[in-house]
Amino acid sequence: MKLTKFLTVFIPFIAGLIYYIQKYHLRSFYQFDPAKLQELSKQSIALYANDTKALLYDLSDRLVAEYGDLITPVNQDEWVHNNAGGAMGTMFILHASFSEYLIFFGTPIGTEGHSGVHMADDYFTILRGRQLAASANDLEARVYLPGDQHVHPWGHTAQYSMPSGEPCFALELAQGWIVSMLPFGFMDGLFSTIDFGTLYKTVYFTAGRMLKSVLMGKF
């Protein structure tokens, strides 16, 4: 009984504290501007709408020009599969820190899954293809096309789809408690696909980017 009373006070207190820090303090660590990312994305889309590789490399160069050493330039050797929420795609980690990550995510063949519930705001800018999304009370899908930015707020959930048989790639920015998002990215690998090689590479690249950020003074 005492434990129950304690938890009914402690859990809301911790939740409120986390929300307060996120709303009024964590934002001070953010370096990436969602509107700027969308602007840069549209510039690359205008040049390479039908060439995924050229589009991603051009956008990577623009991101490096804008954000400098915060960005790891895209290359062919550090792409990894990502299984999360029942969806499967491939990703390249452009930046990772304790308060933000920036990745290329997508698939040449389509996928569908659950967004997850995250202590972060997510900005998903479509670069090629289209994404469909629906919240629990949506009776029609929301459609996002190249240049559109799908904003997924902290704590919300959605079903999403990159339609089967179609390539779809996006620039994804998450801002919030990034470490709290990591289990969502690892659970399928641990308990479903058992793809420990991909898990190792994901942890290796993520930890490396985070360490780089810390050494640069970026939380």
Swiss-Prot record:
Keywords: Endoplasmic reticulum, Isomerase, Lipid biosynthesis, Lipid metabolism, Membrane, Steroid biosynthesis, Steroid metabolism, Sterol biosynthesis, Sterol metabolism, Transmembrane, Transmembrane helix. The chain crosses the membrane at residues 1-21. Its main location: endoplasmic reticulum. GO terms for molecular function: C-8 sterol isomerase activity. It catalyses: fecosterol = episterol. It is a single-pass membrane protein. It is found in: Endoplasmic reticulum membrane. The third module or late pathway involves the ergosterol synthesis itself through consecutive reactions that mainly occur in the endoplasmic reticulum (ER) membrane. Firstly, the squalene synthase erg9 catalyzes the condensation of 2 farnesyl pyrophosphate moieties to form squalene, which is the precursor of all steroids. This is C-8 sterol isomerase erg2. It comes from Schizosaccharomyces pombe (strain 972 / ATCC 24843) (Fission yeast). The gene is erg2.
